[in-house]
Amino acid sequence: MCYKYYQKYKLNSDADNFLTDEFDNVVNQTTDEPLYTDEQENQAIQEQTPKNGGTRGISSDALKYKGYNVAGKIEMPTVRLQYPILGDKVNGSWQVTDANAIEVSVAIQYGVGLNNVGNTVIMGHNYRSGLFFGSNKKLQVGDTIYITDWETGTRRAYTIYNKYTTEESDTSFYQRNTNGKREFSLVTCQSNNSYILVVLAREAE
């Protein structure tokens, strides 16, 4: 029992230190001039492709956490947790290409990519200690979650609008119609591994 809580502390501490010392240091770099005009940003959203490899010219594989590519960052104030989001861009879509990635953080399972129009599925283990998505059961409809994508450095607020349990084989929510909105889905297993807990969120208005 003591080891499990030490493991949670160590992994959370590693994640916090990484996000503060490496991720945020780059994302928070600013310039005197806007990186995008409103027209350019709208065009980039329509194309769902960051210009020039991202607004700072950084690519998705420019930063690694414990050997895995970093796609962005998730902040969940309700449960006081934040983690790097791991993922790889493959043929224009996002996924985690190494199943071992979810042993060190949360990762993209499927989707258009963080902060893009459409749905992105983010998965994480459910540990009793609360590590990774083990505290997702405490999240409620109306809670705010923040996503920062590494490609553009944009931090957006999302609001949870649905939370439910379904069979592990259910992937019907993966390709749902978001009506032109940015959305994401958080997925974690339940204690018996036959069901999953799904949390749906869309960009806050």
Predicted regions and their residues:
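Solvent-exposed, non-transmembrane regions of membrane-associated and secreted proteins
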Residues: 1-205
